[in-house]
Curated annotation (Swiss-Prot):
The lineage of its organism: Bacteria, Bacillati, Bacillota, Bacilli, Lactobacillales. CDD domains: RNase_HII_bacteria_HIII_like, RNAse_HIII_N. GO terms for cellular component: cytoplasm; ribonuclease H2 complex. It comes from the Bacteria. InterPro entries: RNase_HII/HIII, RNase_HII/HIII_dom, RNase_HIII, RNase_HIII_N, RNaseH-like_sf, RNaseH_sf, TBP_dom_sf. HAMAP family: RNase_HIII. Belongs to the RNase HII family. RnhC subfamily. Endonuclease that specifically degrades the RNA of RNA-DNA hybrids. Transmembrane segments: none annotated. This is Ribonuclease HIII. It comes from Streptococcus pyogenes serotype M12 (strain MGAS2096). Manganese or magnesium. Binds 1 divalent metal ion per monomer in the absence of substrate. May bind a second metal ion after substrate binding.
């Protein structure tokens, strides 16, 4: 996916809206004055005058619309690493036990050598042991914002008749992590989120959040493989999640597994037998199917 960002004046804005009048779409982002989608390219015109085109055909559409691409456009391809970037990622959403860790990190091109020496560019190949060794080094060197939503708080917020669902809670966490990082004076050229939902769905849930920022977002699947900033966030978040999982286990006197497989069912049933439902409310995400499976194991 390519992202083109440029500044346009009132005359060009009016011309753009006229050209894309039959392609308009809704946007829940309060900073967006006009939104459209044509040929698979999303067009967002912000109230500030900033125009963003996102999609593989962004360049072609910009030319079709006679936009001043050559002079004022900034282009970021999937593997663009020569600009300062904020990358955001989360860990723990697929695990029954443990909370959700979300981290936003700011990586400048001058950090690349340091990160590659640590093996950050191959973050998916790193073992948990290695992650626990290098995460403290990243936390010390790279500006970042970490958030951890405990299982207990997660269960208070997520579920039927509660404020959030499994997607909207991640939107809230990513948005808050990025917002808080920007408050530190960070000035990225691009903000990338490891995509867990569509941009339109993200913006729908974002509407109810208190804090907002005008910077456009890039959504990329498996973003940690394309952006060092996202890889850094993935590593720090994984370490934060593992620390939380270990602490919860120590509190209960059980080794809590990561993931949502049969091992989680077994440990959950043991916790139910030992302490009752309150132990799962404290350590696990109750709306997962593992809860019912654990209860069923007790009846056998």
């Amino acid at each position: 996916m390519n992202t083109l960002v440029l500044k346009i004046d009132a005359i060009l804005s009016k011309h753009l809206k006229k050209q894309l009048a039959s392609y308009t779409i809704s946007s829940q982002n309060t900073y967006v004055a006009f939104a459209a989608k044509k040929n698979g390219v999303t067009v967002l015109l912000y109230k500030s005058g900033k125009l963003v085109l996102q999609g593989n055909g962004a360049n072609a559409l910009a030319q079709e619309l006679n936009l001043p691409v050559a002079k004022t456009v900034f282009e970021a391809s999937n593997n663009s690493q020569d600009i300062p970037i904020i990358g955001s990622d989360e860990v723990g959403n697929g695990s029954y036990f443990g909370g959700i860790a979300v981290v936003a990190s700011f990586v400048d091109p001058k950090d690349h050598s340091f990160l590659k020496k640590l093996g950050v560019d191959d973050s998916k190949k790193l073992s948990d042991k290695t992650i626990q060794q290098i995460a403290p080094l990243l936390e010390k060197q790279i500006p970042h914002q970490s958030l951890l939503l405990s299982p207990k708080k997660y269960n208070e917020l997520v579920g039927k008749s509660k404020p959030y669902n499994a997607i909207s809670i991640k939107v809230a966490l990513h948005n808050q992590a990025i917002f808080l990082l920007l408050q530190k004076g960070i000035q990225p050229k691009q903000i990338v989120i490891d995509a867990f939902t569509s941009q339109s769905n993200y913006e729908k849930h974002l509407k109810k959040e208190k804090n907002h920022f005008p910077n456009p977002l890039t959504f990329q699947e498996k973003a940690e493989s394309h952006y060092l900033a996202v890889a850094v966030s993935s590593i720090i978040a994984r370490n934060l999640f593992l620390d939380n999982l270990d602490q919860l286990g120590q509190d209960l006197g059980y080794q809590l597994p990561s993931g949502a497989g049969s091992a989680s069912d077994k440990v959950a049933s043991q916790l139910l037998a030992a302490y009752g439902m309150s132990s799962l409310e404290y350590s696990a995400k109750l709306h997962f199917a593992n809860t019912h499976k654990a209860q069923a194991l007790l009846t056998k």
